[in-house]
Amino acid sequence: MTRIAITGIGVVAPGAVGVEAFADLLNRGETAAKPVDRFDTTGLDAHSAALVRDFAPKEFIAPMKLRRMNRLSRFGVAAARMAIADRGGELPTASGVAMGTAFGPVQTSVDYMQQYVEKGAALAPPQLFAESVANAPGSHVGIEFDLRGFNITVTQRESAALTALMYASMQIAKGVVPAAIVGGVDDVSEILFGVLDRVGALGEESRPFDRSRNGMILGEGGAALILEGAKDTPGCAYVSGFGMARDPTASISNWGEREDIVASAMQAAIEDAGLSLHNIDAIYASANSTIAADRLEYRAIQSLFREVPPVVATKGYFGEYAAGGALQLLAAILALRDQKLHASAGFSEGEPEMRFTPTLEPVTKNLQHLLVNSISAGGGVVCGVLSREAQ
């Protein structure tokens, strides 16, 4: 595919607001997961999450507009404003917006339905209903920055942000829009935390690929990227290829068992970028500290690569579903920008059949091409290749 430039980035993440603060979090190797203090977890098995703290939305959004936005929309608009500033100026009006979210505004939906039941349809606040839909954050981004191209929202669980990136990249490559804001948003609500705990999805520590892993840490946040056509456009990284597949053995609540299908999506992304396996300098993995998903991914990696390149697992820092998967993507972009692979937080010992050890320390390395994997419950697999150069 035609390479697409990433010309600006912005982030509201657990433990870090702003790109350089996020880069510092990754470089320190510290997890942002802490005991939950936003709601009571008494009676649950899990008690930790990666929450956004010290975020002041009024620094990014005018007070009158702020009142109309839920937490997800605030994450999205703030991240987009930072990305536009990082770019160095406003986008053309014809630009598009593509946002990803794993679950959308769950808490807003709960708040609206509670008032609907208690007060009736006539008295339930209409502004809450408007914010209860998954595309509210993307709509606010389009309105805030007067962007009149496409405006879509992808709800693909773990793969939401990478799928949104693929859509926007294709539209720019075809000349439909000159540029786009691409991002992801999600937040940790009491009801979502409780449901995931009840089905046994959550653990107390995020330990991707580690043999002692027993569940994911729930994360939240927002991230945004500016995409523009790569010809003569300098960027901090470039989008160069995508691959997709679906595992028919997966159910809505698991990731499936066919490592060959996951490997086929990785292979397709590499070929779409015009590259070979030996061109991939590292893999930014989808591993989320669940037994089944991590095993599926490492088996797929080992089946595709005879010599496995360095593998980085970032969700030990900020949990799963954080910004609809966009934080993992942003970490890979920063690796290319800074020419440094991050350590894999939470890993100490792998399973016996693993032929590789995820990165244990930050590694300064000549990085030209990174593979980013995203495997979602329900069987969807999206893989992308990011490159350092425009050609």
Residue ranges and their predicted role:
Residues 20-25, 107-122, 173, 194-205, ...:
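A glycine- and small-aliphatic-rich helix-loop capping segment at beta-alpha/alpha-beta transitions
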Residues 118-125, 166, 170, 187-234, ...:
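Glycine-/small-residue-rich "gating" segment that lines the acyl/pantetheine channel
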